[in-house]
Amino acid sequence: VLIGSSLGGFYATQLVAKYGVPAVLINPAMRPWQLFHGLFGGELPYVVNAQWTLDQTQLDQLEQMAVPFVQDADKILVLLQQDDEVLDYREAQRYYSNAAHQSMIMTEANGNHAMDNFADKIPMALQFLSDCIK
């Protein structure tokens, strides 16, 4: 079972594609290599913090990891908020709804990248995951 937010949602998607495990994704990043490049103004390497410096090699690795579609997309619950200040929620809507077995997608008006009122969504997420592993 996986739960991933933003970049963690991108990584979780790769693991669902590879292992078929269920996941809950919170405002997942769709193309993080482009996102990071845009956020940091193309200035690489970028020192994120004392332990992490982002460079072009890492961005290239992220791009190589991307999967064109997820076969087991029905094992994914996607939680999106339209006022995400970092990501365009419509990219995730398109990606996760284009699979043969569509993901369950919940899109809310307003909100933000950190997912407003996430605690209210925990019971639904747990029920979804429980149904997936039965």
What do these predicted ranges mean?
Residues 1-3, 25:
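Short, conserved beta-strand segments within well-ordered enzyme catalytic domains
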Residues 22-133:
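The alpha/beta-hydrolase serine catalytic core
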Residues 15-19:
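Aromatic pocket-lining residues of Rossmann-like dinucleotide-binding sites
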Residues 3-8, 12:
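Gly/Ala-rich beta-loop-alpha elbow adjacent to hydrolase catalytic centers
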